[in-house]
């Protein structure tokens, strides 16, 4: 059957509505009837030019090429616009409205939640709308997208990947408004120093070059900076020159500088066989959450927006600790605990034991070390499989009052969810960075006898489509074993 449009076709569209994940919706009438077009990073009120990347009988997915007309409500920005902040020109209140409406639509359609008016507790905004990130990754490329001519040129570039490409970068010449003003307003000087060495930037299609990535991690607690320059091993790096440059540009805030060798052809910072070493200063910066300090290395996973993460964890604490102190002998479990951030925060504020469980032994070692450093005593960490935990530690059977889940974006697999059920917890606090997979998992949790009691959204990433969610589920009494 002939379709209304074909792959590669360029369309001019008026965006009328929003779908979850930052997809603008255009509705068209064709010879074959109503047709829906989704355009990533477009939003209502805009007229855009977009290219079809996938076409079905009644809908198409498009890549945004350019905005032809802005929406009436869009704001003028004091920052350089970047691909990673598609909503930067949208008033924050409207961003919250879109995130709420599109997320709740998922819980209705995918999760089958019929009582959202009763359980939804609103959206928690980020304390900071601008300069909230604590880490930024900049890419080098020999292919630069010129923002003035909107063309690709052969040139030394350092900045962000141009939207829809993996090979071309847009030079960052000014503060983007998301990270650190000092770092980003002087990044062009780092680019010029690297270019002056005569060594080439990475050429993604040809898979060759020298300079690959510059990663900067920042402590929001004290402003300290950790810098990692990623190169191939094709030539020696002028280490002294690079260290002098970074310290001159960013001063006493620089706490450590690393050099990572990465000869992998893939477009990622971490190399499978490369090595990373400290060439000046320390290997970590210190971040503080709820009065606890955490040493964060360049490779550590840590919340990107610490100020908003404090609000997220405050919501988790309120739910996890509710009623537990009136139940002597009960325990709270932090499942998939990683390096134990949530578990330590809970333990600091609880008068009950907290148990952290993760299948990765190194993560558990790091969690124990961090708890010792913070003086948190009523938390125990175990390297164990969730499904076997009660068999290996029968002393906790019947004592798990609340289990806190914080899985990756993919959510919880059915197999893992069955393991969670074996823990026989009375309550589950489910933290999610992807409401779509959380909504899917709520269906299975409901069939296993858990009822959704409350749901709250948390805006961790202003100016993007991302939103996090915290859900409380309780075992239905008449189904409890």
Locations of regions flagged by a protein language model:
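Internal alpha/beta scaffold segment
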Residues: 166-212, 233-259, 265
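Conserved loop-to-beta-strand segment in the C-terminal subdomain of adenylate-forming
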Residues: 59, 222-226, 465
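Short beta-strand micro-motifs enriched in acidic
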Residues: 51-55, 139-145, 217-221, 474
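Terminal RNA-binding accessory module
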Residues: 1-78, 160, 165, 380, ...
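Rossmann-like S-adenosyl-L-methionine
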Residues: 2-9, 20, 24, 234-481
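Extended interfacial segments that mediate partner engagement and assembly in macromolecular machines
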Residues: 65-203, 221
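Peripheral terminal and linker regions in Fe-S/redox and tRNA-modifying enzymes
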Residues: 57, 66, 135, 147, ...
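Short, aliphatic-rich beta-strand segments
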Residues: 216, 223-232, 293-297
